[in-house]
Structure formats: structure tokens, C-alpha cells
């Protein structure tokens, strides 16, 4: 779907970004902030945002340049999994092992695979954790992708939706046993929608937040079709129905918090700590984890 423009240095189009410039956060509600802290902060080694939502009823957990928003309500489990890039999988394994005793009786588990670690949160959300590598560009800590499971036959229409309605690029459909739509949503970030024949439960209410350069075109599309969930307010709007851009057929449900680049939080720097820093083995000057700007 992307026109390849060759230059002396190779494929110039490979450096293009589309209208979606950043996947900023994934929001899933959790019923217990203490268990969430054991998993996201102690286990995964992420960083509780020191500036925003510091009450006991919500937590923003930073992962490089992205976040998890974890307000207190009944648990939301998204169909699929979340990809993470973490700097040290051996340290991750030690941390996950250390929290097992505190997460007994929940759905928490973890498994070391050949090239990644699978971690399941106390309520069933799946995380696949990798070390930095070429497939993730220059990301050394962050959320490179989120993969959602969708009904058979939906991938092509979803790809067309993101390309034509949201202006995303690059957009591709990888065919095979389980076709998957791959949507570029900023520097080293993707949304993936993989077809499955397995039964899919009802939409749980989770959402994602993205920043877009042109917000009016997609807003007009949804407004004309009565698909706006929350109108423009504070430089953002919300929708949740992904539809075929031609026929209007519903393809999947995923709430999007769509923010313009005029939003005051665009470009907000995220604090990330060094999770290997401990009181017993303290190393002066190594409290912070520094990510490339």
C-alpha cells in the first residue's frame, strides 16, 4: 500500500511517517493497585510517573516514551498481547521470580522463551518482552507494538481504515495462516490486528491514545457517520468503532483517544528509572534510565 520512492541512499519511503505520529498509552483498568504495583513496577521494572495521577486510585506506568494508564475499576483484558522492549531479560527474569510470592492466587505467570519472555499480569493481560534489536529500530526501552485479535476476514478492511481514514503509514497486510494488518503509528511503533478463528469475547473497554498531525479529517469522517464517542474537547476526541471505510461494515471495536499535536501533553518527557538500582547494591549516578531523545 506504500509507494516506494528510491533514492541514492536506498528506499526513501522507509523513513516516512504517516498522520499517526505516536502511540502514547494503553489504558486498562485494574481492581487492585497494590497487585498492579507488584507486576508493572517491581516485576516488569517500569516507572510510576512521579508527576501525574499519584493517588492510590490510579497509576501511570512509564515504559520509555510510552505509558500504561491503570485506573481502579474491574479488570480489563485486551484480546491479544502487548510488546515491550526492555534492556535486560536476565534481570527481568529475576524480578518476575521475586514477585511470584506476592501474586499467588492471581493469573500471574511468566515463561522464558528462546528470544523473549512472556509475562501475564494478575488479571490476564499478556506481555511479550524483548531486548533491543534491529526489528525495533533504535528503541531500547518502550512499547514497540500492541497486537489485537480480530475476526476472520477483518485484517484487510482494518488496514484500509487506518490508511484512508486515519492517514496512517506505512500500512500492510501480511497474509498467511493468520493474516495480520500492520499499522505504523510513529517512530518504531505499530498496531497489529491478527485474524483468529478462536472465539472473541465482548469488548472490555480498554483504550489506546495516539497523536495525529491532522485531526480534522478523521474527526469529520466519524462525525458524518455518527461514530463520535466523545467530541472535540481539550484538543482531542474519541471513537471506538473501526469500520470498512467504503461500506461502513463494523470490523472491530477499540476505543481511540485521538489527540492533536496542539495537545499540551504532546512531547511531555517521561521519567524512567534504572530498575537494577537497589539499596544494597547502590551505584551513585545510575538512578535514571536514559533513553535516546
PLM region descriptions:
Residues 10-12, 16-72, 78-86, 98:
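An N-terminus-focused feature that recognizes amino-terminal "leader" regions
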Amino acid at each position: 500500500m506504500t509507494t516506494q520512492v528510491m533514492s541514492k541512499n536506498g528506499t526513501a519511503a522507509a523513513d516516512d511517517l504517516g498522520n499517526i505520529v505516536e502511540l502514547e498509552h494503553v489504558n486498562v483498568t485494574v481492581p487492585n493497585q497494590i497487585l498492579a504495583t507488584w507486576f508493572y513496577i517491581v516485576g516488569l521494572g517500569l516507572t510510576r510517573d512521579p508527576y501525574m495521577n499519584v493517588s492510590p486510585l490510579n497509576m501511570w506506568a512509564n515504559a520509555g516514551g510510552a505509558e500504561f494508564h491503570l485506573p481502579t475499576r474491574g479488570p480489563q483484558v485486551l484480546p491479544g498481547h502487548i510488546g515491550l522492549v526492555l534492556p535486560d531479560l536476565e534481570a527481568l527474569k529475576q524480578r518476575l521470580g521475586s514477585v511470584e510470592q506476592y501474586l499467588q492466587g492471581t493469573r500471574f505467570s511468566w515463561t522464558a522463551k528462546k528470544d523473549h519472555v512472556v509475562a501475564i499480569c494478575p488479571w490476564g493481560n499478556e506481555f511479550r518482552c524483548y531486548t533491543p534489536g534491529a526489528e525495533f529500530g533504535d528503541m531500547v526501552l518502550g512499547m514497540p507494538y500492541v497486537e489485537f485479535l480480530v475476526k476472520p476476514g477483518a485484517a484487510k478492511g482494518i488496514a484500509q481504515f487506518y490508511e484512508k481514514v486515519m492517514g496512517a503509514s506505512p500500512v500492510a497486510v501480511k497474509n498467511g495462516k493468520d493474516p495480520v494488518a500492520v499499522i505504523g503509528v510513529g517512530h518504531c511503533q505499530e498496531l497489529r490486528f491478527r485474524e483468529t478463528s478462536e472465539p472473541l469475547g465482548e469488548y472490555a473497554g480498554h483504550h489506546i491514545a495516539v497523536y495525529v498531525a491532522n485531526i480534522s479529517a478523521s474527526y469529520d469522517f466519524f462525525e458524518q457517520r455518527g461514530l463520535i464517542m466523545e467530541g472535540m474537547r481539550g484538543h482531542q476526541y474519541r471513537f471506538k468503532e473501526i469500520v470498512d471505510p467504503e461500506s461502513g461494515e463494523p470490523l472491530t471495536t477499540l476505543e481511540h483517544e485521538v489527540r492533536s499535536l496542539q495537545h499540551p501533553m504532546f512531547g511531555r518527557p517521561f521519567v524512567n528509572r534504572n530498575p537494577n538500582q537497589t539499596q544494597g547494591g547502590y551505584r551513585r549516578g545510575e538512578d535514571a534510565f536514559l533513553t535516546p531523545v
